[in-house]
Amino acid sequence: MIGVILVLASLLSVGGQLCQKQATRPLTAGGRRRHLMLWLGLALICMGAAMVLWLLVLQTLPVGIAYPMLSLNFVWVTLAAWKIWHEQVPPRHWLGVALIISGIIILGSAA
């Protein structure tokens, strides 16, 4: 169960970061303020919820195990940037993502 909460905390944190990115996207001048407030508001909600879930994780897992699991954020952000905004991800970056996933698996199996 704590693993599910950890993944959800990670996803919400990433959701908040992606909302911040979306808030910076160019728009016509007329809707800029509303666009900015919407995405920054969503970012705050996501990051606030992530923080609450993260506190639950820290009550259960040692911080030395839990914190490295947040490396999942790098994986989620890379995938989202690639899929949502069609950002180019070089092979070297994908190798880094694979190494992060490997590290998470190794650390997770030690928990």
Curated annotation (Swiss-Prot):
Pathway recorded for this protein: Bacterial outer membrane biogenesis; lipopolysaccharide biosynthesis
Parts of the chain that traverse the membrane: 38-58, 61-81, 91-111
Main location (coarse class): membrane
One term under GO cellular component: plasma membrane
Localisation: Cell inner membrane
Domain EamA: 40-109
Pfam families per record: EamA (PF00892)
Record keywords, A-Z: Cell inner membrane, Cell membrane, Lipid A biosynthesis, Lipid biosynthesis, Lipid metabolism, Lipopolysaccharide biosynthesis, Membrane, Transmembrane, Transmembrane helix, Transport
Oligomeric form and interacting partners: Heterodimer of ArnE and ArnF.
Protein family (similarity comment): Belongs to the ArnE family.
Protein name: Probable 4-amino-4-deoxy-L-arabinose-phosphoundecaprenol flippase subunit ArnE
Gene name as annotated: arnE
